[in-house]
Amino acid sequence: MAREPLKSSEQLFAVLSNASDARPPLVAPSPIWADTIYAEWDAVMPFAGIVAADSEFLDWVASTESRDWGRLAVSSASLEVVVEHFRSLTQVLMPGGTAVFFRFWDGRFLLPILQSDEVQSAQLIPVISRGLINGQAVDIGGRAQVSGRVFPWWKVPESVLASAGNAVR
């Protein structure tokens, strides 16, 4: 974020895992699976919240060694739209058509997918322009202000599975 400060139209979001032992210190995040059949799954619920540019949370992000806590994302969309889009990624379709849960908040899984030549990041996450995943700045390129998708809609390319091995299974 230091290399490319937020524009006046942008907000910084944290996308968090409730299952991480790291326990990121973010106040009042929105549960992503609210209003789904998984709304009661508190122990593994992913969350999203707005992070102030001067938040102490960013110091925690810079110093944590944890790789499963979540990630940072920049968007011009509202918190509600960001949550709605990540909710649409609750499940994805494997090459054989089976719907599986997608750990979109976990950089260990998401980063190799976004780095794949077979995945157009701005189509997968159209409401996010850029982010920070496991200490790496990532350009997503999304500019959308709405999502409107319902899971499962994204099909994991076979080549992503082949190149990542068991890392994304």
Residue ranges, per PLM feature:
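Terminal low-complexity "docking" segments
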Residues: 1-103, 107-169
